[in-house]
Regions:
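Small/aliphatic-rich secondary-structure junction motif
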Residues: 1-62, 140-143, 150, 156-220, ...
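Short low-complexity, flexible loop/linker segments enriched in glycine and/or proline
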Residues: 50-52, 161-162, 230-233, 257-258
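A short acidic, glycine-rich active-site loop
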Residues: 58-76
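Short, small-residue-enriched loops and turns at beta-alpha junctions
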Residues: 125-126, 194-198, 221-223, 249-250
Length: 275
């Protein structure tokens, strides 16, 4: 499926400029539109720390006031980043809006009406906003999610590494990545073998039917397949890693599998994930 609509949810202003510029760069290459939605925080969420405690009305009012000021400042910064990025866009249709509903719902609703979702990687364990957005996009949209590192490369998808293990998730990821793969100048299929080698002939032949010439590479996984894959992608000088997202879901909480978690936390290149 061609990429014609790119969705960029912004939970805050951190990294917004780089995320937007990367999305616009993709849109220019694919001839796509970019839909940006700022997910404005609900000030009442700031009261969560006081649940079960006896607090004065004055303290509640003060907490809400400060939370609203912070939300307003973040919204202004996000809009400023969008306006600056929009000025550099060349022939790209852009739209910007602000959502005050639950961020999960907003991401899922808009993401399902897009061809790909572009988000930034969480900068650490305390970067809850970015983590929530990425999880909602992966678990609730049914769309491929492009997770960007802190500093995205100037070009994304010219040199691609596919993490292949013959799984359903990996198969979905490859299919979703075809718009990138058919434009790439170099494609490598990497399998991290723990015990027995994974047959890559089938996936390489499949890619060939789409005009994609790929080479197969096998690496020893050892005790950490995620580390082996990321290291191999780095050695290949890839600017895009394609992989399935492995997880265990508990109601609305997502627990990533080891390979996915390592890639998300340590890879310094964009990762296209499909759950």
């Amino acid at each position: 499926m061609p990429i014609k609509t790119i969705f960029v949810p912004l939970s805050d202003a951190e990294g917004a400029a780089k995320t937007l510029n990367a999305a616009i760069g993709l849109a220019e290459g694919f001839g796509a539109a970019v839909n940006v939605v700022h997910l404005r925080a609900d000030p009442t969420q700031a009261l969560g720390d006081f649940v079960g405690e006896s607090v004065s009305p004055q303290l509640v009012e003060e907490v809400l006031t400060q939370a609203e000021k912070r939300a307003t400042a973040i919204a202004a910064a996000a809009r400023k980043a969008y306006d600056a990025a929009a000025k550099t866009a060349k022939g790209v249709k852009l739209s910007y809006s602000e959502s005050t509903i639950n961020s999960d719902v907003a991401v899922e609703t808009q993401g399902r009406l897009s061809d790909i979702v572009v988000v930034r990687r969480a900068s650490g364990t305390r970067d809850v906003g970015a983590r929530v957005v990425a999880e909602a996009a992966l678990m609730g949209t049914g769309r491929p999610v492009l997770v960007l590192p802190t500093t995205p490369p100037a070009k994304i998808g010219t040199s691609v590494v596919i993490a292949w293990n013959d799984s359903l998730e990996a198969s979905k990821a490859v299919n979703a990545a075809l718009p990138f793969l058919t434009r790439a100048t170099r494609v490598s299929v990497i399998s991290a073998n723990a015990e027995s080698a994974i047959d890559q002939k089938g996936i390489i032949a499949y890619l060939g039917t789409h005009g994609v010439k790929a080479r197969g590479v096998s690496v020893k996984a050892g005790a950490d397949a995620g580390k082996a894959i990321v290291s191999a992608a780095t050695r290949a000088k890839a600017n895009l890693l394609v992989m399935g997202a492995y997880s265990h879901s508990r109601v609305r909480e997502m627990i990533f599998g080891g390979v996915t978690e390592h890639a998300l936390s340590s890879a310094r290149l964009p990762i296209l994930l499909v759950h």
